[in-house]
Curated annotation (Swiss-Prot):
GO BP terms: translation
Gene: rplC
Quaternary structure (record): Part of the 50S ribosomal subunit. Forms a cluster with proteins L14 and L19.
Presence of keyword Lyase: no
Organism, scientific name: Caldicellulosiruptor bescii (strain ATCC BAA-1888 / DSM 6725 / KCTC 15123 / Z-1320) (Anaerocellum thermophilum)
Identification of the protein by name: Large ribosomal subunit protein uL3
Family of the protein in this entry: Belongs to the universal ribosomal protein uL3 family.
Gene Ontology CC terms, in alphabetical order: cytosolic large ribosomal subunit
Amino acid sequence: MTKGILGKKIGMTQIFDEAGRAIPVTVIEAGPCVVVQKKTVEKDGYSAIQVGFEDIKESKLNKPLRGHFAKHGVKPKRFLRELRLKDADKYEVGQEIRVDIFQPGEKVDVTGISKAKGFQGVIKRHGQQRGPMSHGSMYHRRVGSMGSNTFPARTFPGKKMPGRMGGERVTVLNLQVVKVDPDRNLLLVKGSVPGNKNSLLIIRDSVKSK
């Protein structure tokens, strides 16, 4: 990974290309971010930068975080994330990272926390087929068979069962950058990204782009 930025999901809309085709896009408020800390191979064993996004009152931070920002001379930020970059040496503490590091046509990977759905059954959670809905059926939306009785006489680990759905870290790969608006710190990517509106996103250059 050579570049990355933090952002906030605004929502989805559509724009039209030169041929008049509608393109579904997600609008992301990306940056500006500030480099809070640098990590080097000599001192930390790996190369990375710690970036902060979105200003916050100092009174809302705990004492260790207040000291962390004061030590590096950076204004307090709401979000802190670490980006492991190959060329972290070119960044300096206090340097601002803006959305114009990306250009239209590039491919990016977007990471976020998926929408939480609460406790759900196997049909919604895993896409399983329901049972017969006719009269006399013993089940409709139940799990079905969970294993044999005599052998192995247990349910194998990993069996798809009802449970809490969503609220997990999800990365969507190879999304195309459609438009960049540096004046308003907006990044438009083709397709959908995980998370609710105003949720935190990590945008990085694609690692598997062809």
